[in-house]
Amino acid sequence: MSLSQKEIIERVRAIAEPIVTSMGLELFDVKYRIQAGKWVLSIIIDKLDDYVSTRDCELVSYEIEKVLDSHDFIPGRYYLEVSSPGLDRPLKKIEDFRRFVGKLVKVKTKKTYRGYIVDVNMETKEIILRVDNENITIKYDDVKSANLEIEL
C-alpha cells in the first residue's frame, strides 16, 4: 500500500526528530515535493545557539539516509536534501520570536509590518515590534506568516 505525501512526511519526521535532537540540533521542517520533475525529500535543521554548518548537514544526511534505507517506505527514487532554514528563515513558533529579539522581521497579519522584535510576552502571547520608531503589539494568534529580514 502506497503512503500519501502527508504520511511520508509524518514518518520521516518521526524518524528524523530523535536523530537530529541527539546531534544537538533541532528539526525545523520536513518537506516532500516534486521539484524539476523529481521527488525531493527536504529535511531542514537548525541550531539554537549557532549557525548550521555544512558538516552538520552532512552528518544528519548520513544518519537519516541509513535509517530511511532500512525502513524503505518511500516509493521510487527521491533525492535527500538536508539544509538550514536560511538567513530569511520563517518564524513558525512564538519561541522563534523570543529567540530573535533585536532582529529585523517581516510579520503578516491583516497588515504587513517590518520592524525589530523588541520583546515577546510568552504569557499573553504578544510580540512587540519597533516599527518606524513606534512600538506595536501584535497577538501571536493573529500572525499569518513571519520571517527574518536580511539587513544589508
UniProtKB/Swiss-Prot annotation:
Classification via InterPro entries: Ribosome_maturation_RimP (IPR003728), RimP_C (IPR028998), RimP_C_sf (IPR036847), RimP_N (IPR028989), RimP_N_sf (IPR035956)
Role played: Required for maturation of 30S ribosomal subunits.
Top-level taxonomy: Bacteria, Thermotogati, Thermotogota, Thermotogae, Thermotogales
Family: Belongs to the RimP family.
Protein name, as recorded: Ribosome maturation factor RimP
Superkingdom of origin: Bacteria
A matching Pfam family: RimP_N
UniProt entry keywords in alphabetical sequence: Cytoplasm, Ribosome biogenesis
Organism: Fervidobacterium nodosum (strain ATCC 35602 / DSM 5306 / Rt17-B1)
GO CC terms of this entry: cytosol
Biological process (GO), any one: ribosomal small subunit assembly
Coiled coil location: none
Protein's cellular compartments: Cytoplasm
